Amino acid sequence: MAVYVVTGKLGAGKTLVAVGKIQDKIVSGCRVATNLDLRIHKLPRVGIFAKSPDVIRIPDKPSLDDLLAIGRGNNSYDENKNGLLVLDECGTWFNSRSWADKERQSVINWFLHARKLGWDIIFLIQDLSIMDKQARVALAEHVVYCRRLDKITIPFIGSIYSVITGSKLPLPKVHVGIVKYGDSPQSMTVERWTYTGRDLYAAYDTKQAFSDAYEHSSFSYLTPYLSHGRYAVKRDATFYMRLTRIYLKKYSRVLCLFCGFVSAFTYLSLSKPEATPQIKPVTTQIITSRYKPSELRITTSYRMGNAVGFEFMDAKKQKIASDDLIKDGFRMVYITPCSVELIKDGKHEKVTC
C-alpha cells in the first residue's frame, strides 16, 4: 500500500496534484473515494462517454461508518489495482488533540489497516508539522512537497526583466510534486509529479469549503456517460450539415461580400482587352558581292599537289587572289589551269584567262 501526505502552501497545487492522481486511477479502471467535489466528465482523459468510472463522494470529515461503507478498493493481491482514497483538509484530523480523541481513534485505526482493504491513500495537509508525530510515523510513508514554478524567479534574468518592465518575469504555471520516501525533507526523492493544471481546473471545485456538518452521506457519482454522454449530440453527417448551415446563416453577409469581391476580380481579369501584338518590320539586308565574276579573268594559276591557286584581275586592273574570293563566299571548282568555275548563292559562272 502507498500512503502519500501531500503538503504545500495555499495555492501550491495540492488538490490539483491529487485530482491528477484520481484521473490516473480512473483511467486504469480502479476505484476512487474522496471528499472532493469532482466533475468527472471534465477530466480530459476520461471524457463524457466513459461508462466505467467508480467514484464515491464521502463526507468532508468521514466517520468510521462512512469509511466502512466504501468497501474494499481491490479484491486481488495486485497492489497496482488498489483503489485510491483522497482526503483534503486533514490538518484538523491528525493534530495532537484529534489524535488522542477517542471518537476519531476508530477512524485512525481504519487508516492504519487500509492496506488490507486494498486502498492507497492521499492525505492533503498544508504543512507536515501540523500532523501529530505518531501519525507521521505511522502513516506518512511518502511525503509530497508541492511547488509552483511560476512563483520562482530566475536569477539574474528575472532581475533584469523586473528592472526593465517593473513586473515579475512571467513563467508557465506548472505544478511539481516532489515525492520523498519518508517524513524528512532530506529523505530520498523517489519520483516527481508534474501537472500543468490548465486541463484539470474544471474537474473540481477550487473554492470548495469543508464543514464538520456535511449534510449528505456517502454516494456514488454517476458515470460521465449517464450524466452527460447520453445527452450529447451525435456527431454524424447530419450534425455537421446542420452546423454548416448555422455558420453559413451567421456569416452570410460576410460571405456574400467576399464572393462579390472575388466575382468582380475574376470578371475584370477575364474581360481585360488583349494587347494587340506589334509587328516589327523585318529588314532584310541584301548583301552584295564585292566581286563580279563576269569582270574577272585569270592572270596566274598554280598547282602544288592538291593545292590550287589563282590570281585574277578585274576591269579596273586590280589584282584579286583566290583567297579573297573564298572570303567573299565564293566556292571555286578547278577545271584547267586557265579555267575555273565560281559558285555563289546557287549561281555558276566560268572564268577563263
UniProtKB/Swiss-Prot annotation:
Compartments reported by the entry? Host membrane
Q: Which gene encodes it?
A: I
Provide the GO MF annotations for this entry: ATP binding
Which keywords has UniProt assigned to this entry? ATP-binding, Host membrane, Membrane, Nucleotide-binding, Transmembrane, Transmembrane helix, Viral extrusion, Viral release from host cell
Please describe what this protein does.
Isoform G1P plays an essential role in phage assembly. It is required to increase the number of adhesion zones between the inner and outer membranes of the host cell. The extrusion of neo-synthesized phages occurs at these adhesion sites. May be involved with G4P in creating zone through which the phage assembled and extruded. Isoform G11P is also involved in phage assembly, probably playing a structural role in the formation of the phage assembly site.
Q: What is this protein called?
A: Gene 1 protein
Q: How does it sit in the membrane?
A: Single-pass membrane protein
Q: Name one Pfam family in it.
A: Zot
- Which positions in this protein are listed as binding ATP? 8-15
Domain of life assignment: Viruses
List the GO cellular component terms. host cell membrane; membrane
Say which family it is in: Belongs to the inovirus G1P protein family.
